[in-house]
A protein has these predicted regions:
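A short, acidic/glycine-rich surface segment
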Residues: 57-64, 132-134
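Alpha-helical elements of the RecA-like P-loop NTPase motor core of helicases
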Residues: 18, 87, 122
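Hydrophobic/basic alpha-helical segments enriched in Actinobacteria
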Residues: 16, 23-28, 33-34, 67-70, ...
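Vicinal oxygen chelate
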Residues: 4-12, 41, 63-92, 94-141
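Core segments of cupin and vicinal oxygen chelate
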Residues: 8-58
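N-terminal beta-strand motif that seeds the catalytic metal site of vicinal oxygen chelate
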Residues: 1-19, 24, 75-78, 128-141
């Protein structure tokens, strides 16, 4: 297994984000969300979301950073193990207060997108492994 990966997200309300991500079924780092202006959410082994108060995020990236989460200039895409798991994850996100943005189903690829309460866009997708190896971008060996 390689090194851990972190996505850093500015949020307006840390407590709301904590509730949203735990309702999504993701877990919290044990020392997170304890008055530091930040928290770490474990998406799955090796994948984390660092949520920072807007002030803490501004300190990290500096003043005058263009864009807001609602711009959706970044889509955080996570692949899952099955077609049905796409729906399970996104349905939990919607029950937790997320908003559905888009969905695609081509049989060999299933994708649904949602925005979290701060407007960050997430794409949950599944690609049939057999179909992916037949795609022109993946030459046969």
């Amino acid at each position: 297994m390689g090194p851990d990966e972190f996505i850093t997200l500015p949020v307006r309300d840390l407590e709301r984000s904590r509730r949203f991500y735990t309702r999504l079924g993701w877990s919290l780092h044990p020392s997170s969300f304890r008055g530091s202006g930040s928290g770490t959410v474990l998406i799955r082994e090796g994948e984390h979301a660092m949520v920072l108060s807007e002030d803490r995020h501004r300190h990290l990236v500096g003043p005058g950073t263009p864009g807001t989460p609602a711009d959706a200039s970044v889509v955080n895409a996570l692949s899952v193990d099955s077609h049905d798991e796409v729906d399970a994850v996104v349905d939990r996100a919607l029950r937790a207060g997320g908003t559905e943005v888009d969905a695609q189903d081509y049989g060999f690829l299933r994708s649904r997108c949602f925005r979290d309460p701060d407007g960050h866009q997430w794409e949950i997708l599944w690609v049939d492994p057999a179909a992916a190896t037949r795609h022109p971008a993946h030459p046969q060996r």
